Amino acid sequence: MSADPPAHIPPARAPADRPVPTPVSGDTWLDFAIRAVIPGTIGTILIAIGALGIGWLPLDTALLDNPVVDALRSTTLGAVVSKTALVAGVVLLLQSWLLLGYDVMRGQDRDIKRLWIALAAWCAPLMLCPPLFSRDVYSYFAQGKLMVAGIDPYTRGSSSVPGWFNDGVDPMWAEAPTPYGQFWLLLAKGVAQFTGPHPYSGALMMRLLTVAGVVMLAWAIPKIAFHGGIAPSKALWLGVLNPLVLMHFVAGAHNDALMVGLIAAGFAVTLERLPILGVVLVTLGGSVKPIGLVALPFVGLLW
């Protein structure tokens, strides 16, 4: 008596045939805020507090008359508090960035809007603090004052402006002509005209210009990454939320931010089939710092 034939078993679906779930954020907005946004913001608040004690301030500012600022800058305890706050803030910001990156790299959090919110929250406390790590922003302001006075900044240094030292200009660059382009000098002139004889207010307005560059980066980098087959969230996390970017471009208020932001925006719109606008934006970036013009031929390659 023969055995019954085995029942037909349908072949298993190959893993490649299985539907791939769309990546979604692995936690709620509240979880995201508690895990990354709030700790990073506390970090930049501490950095801003530290900047009151060890950041660059011009001699000609009423902020030095504030008793808290005076204590942070003129006493041993104040110096210790300022340095401790700065170091603790940087460590906390770095930790928050790395934790966020862990989620992004695992694909747990790919929501660009969340990353933009984290960036805005981390930057906010740095908007009003004294410049850190560089006082170039006061040289920008002085060069704007040169323009207002009708002095050619390509032949004369910031020392040609009366009171340049009290304005916070670094003596190392006081005699040097400007290395920057016409577009940046026009912006600096506008800031100097608007703020008048108030170098710290001028520095804060200059910071708005550099933050505009960071905003352009945050918009452009994900688009460039998408066209290159890279996850936009990973590119945004690595290229814009990086603490080095926040320290140099926001806390340091360095005009490299505007140059790089314009160039990145130019590349992004070129990839979106707007090459003429791309050329204009990259050219403006080169008119902030002439080294940016090196990027112009790459628009042609993308075109």
Please report, for each region that a protein language model flagged, where it lies by residue.
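Start-transfer (signal-anchor) and selected internal transmembrane alpha helices
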Residues: M1-L46, N66-P125
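Alpha-helical transmembrane segments of multi-pass membrane proteins
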Residues: T41-A62
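Transmembrane-helix motifs of polytopic, lipid-linked glycan transferases
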Residues: V91-G101, L204-G228, W237, G261
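Transmembrane-helix signature of polytopic, membrane-embedded enzymes
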Residues: D109-I117, I221-P243
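Intramembrane catalytic core of multi-pass membrane enzymes that act on lipidic substrates
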Residues: D109-V211
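Aromatic- and kink-enriched transmembrane "portal" helix at the membrane-lumen/periplasm boundary
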Residues: P199, A203, V214-L217, W237-M259, ...
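Specific aromatic-rich, kink-prone transmembrane helix
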Residues: M216-A220, M259-L274
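Perimembrane helix-loop-helix junctions
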Residues: V294-W303
